[in-house]
Amino acid sequence: MRTQLSDIQRMKDRGERLVMVTAYDYTSAQLVDRTDIPLILVGDSLGMVIQGNSSTVPVTIDEMVYHTKAVMRGSSKALVVGDLPFLSYTSPEQAIQNAGKLMQIGGCGAVKLEGGVNLAPTVRRLVDLGIPVMGHLGFTPQSVNQIGMRVQGKTVAHARQLLDDALALEAAGAFAIVLELIPAALAKAITARLHIPTIGIGAGVGCDGEVQVWHDILGLYSDHLPRHTKRYADLGSTIEQALTQYAHEVRERSFPTAANSSVIDANTLAEALGEQTVSVGASAKVAV
């Protein structure tokens, strides 16, 4: 049975840590489905780890729908949250249209958007229409050209603003909030003041849960590993070794072998090629 919004709130109420990970396709979603991870984020981070862009800004709503559909085909247990990408929710009306597309066509169970007090009216409109919304505060990747990639909330004014933003999102009906790249003590304080769950990334252990990028934790991304993540496997090296071995065996003609091939009756092949058929007692099968 798929994770429900009520399950997420119940986990916070019980003090059970929430686990969330990104997934971008059918295969990664299937692998998550083999675990007990209750939340999948189809993040616009795909712009970087899938498309090779330097930020999430170029990602479009149609691309998000495409990847969300693929994830939904591979997932049967997790609550799947789809990102609304840059400039896809500049007005409540546009947000409704694109969030609706992400849920109706993509199939996800909720959407995520970046912003605080300024986005609260949009969040309220979405929630009133039955669209579950996850907020996102702190470092907001879609604003990277304005704020840069650095820790947020380190001044009195900014810390207060983040708290106000979180309270506004909760009041507007958001079911959870991602807190990214903010001081751990501030994230813990915000979490304590909210009734809804917080999910951290680079925000310390005081949040109600954690989200990490698939490629980072599995060692698939060769670029610099951010301080706020941890590599749990080195699949990049494993894949490189496998590809190198595959290429070697193909060049040395040790792959494919007879076990990897099909056979055809020798006389059938000879007749098809207009050649003399084999004599009785000769090998009746030819590998192809």
Curated annotation (Swiss-Prot):
Q: Which GO terms describe its cellular component?
A: cytoplasm
Binding of Mg(2+): at which residues? 44, 83, 114
Which SUPFAM superfamilies does the record cross-reference, listed alphabetically? Phosphoenolpyruvate/pyruvate domain
Name of protein: 3-methyl-2-oxobutanoate hydroxymethyltransferase
What molecular function terms (GO) are annotated for this protein? 3-methyl-2-oxobutanoate hydroxymethyltransferase activity; magnesium ion binding
Q: Which Pfam families match?
A: Pantoate_transf
**What does the entry comment about cofactor binding?**
Binds 1 Mg(2+) ion per subunit.
Keyword annotations of the record: Cytoplasm, Magnesium, Metal-binding, Pantothenate biosynthesis, Transferase
Is Magnesium one of the keywords? yes
Give the enzyme's EC designation: 2.1.2.11
Q: Which PANTHER family does the entry link to? A: 3-METHYL-2-OXOBUTANOATE HYDROXYMETHYLTRANSFERASE
Its annotated compartments are:
Cytoplasm
Q: Per the similarity annotation, which family is this? A: Belongs to the PanB family.
Reading the lineage from the top rank, the first entry is Bacteria
Spell out the reaction equation it catalyses.
Answer: 3-methyl-2-oxobutanoate + (6R)-5,10-methylene-5,6,7,8-tetrahydrofolate + H2O = 2-dehydropantoate + (6S)-5,6,7,8-tetrahydrofolate
Asked if the keyword Transferase belongs to this entry, the reply reads yes
- What is the protein's known function? Catalyzes the reversible reaction in which hydroxymethyl group from 5,10-methylenetetrahydrofolate is transferred onto alpha-ketoisovalerate to form ketopantoate.
Name one process (GO BP) from the record. pantothenate biosynthetic process
| Organism of this sequence | Herpetosiphon aurantiacus (strain ATCC 23779 / DSM 785 / 114-95)
Stored CDD domains: KPHMT-like
Quaternary structure (record): Homodecamer; pentamer of dimers.
Instruction: List S-S links within the chain.
Output: none
Amino-acid positions noted as binding 3-methyl-2-oxobutanoate in the UniProt annotation, renumbered to this chain? 44-45, 83, 112
Q: In which pathway does it act?
A: Cofactor biosynthesis; (R)-pantothenate biosynthesis; (R)-pantoate from 3-methyl-2-oxobutanoate: step 1/2
The residues annotated as the active site are 180 (proton acceptor)
For activity, the cofactor(s) needed are:
Mg(2+)
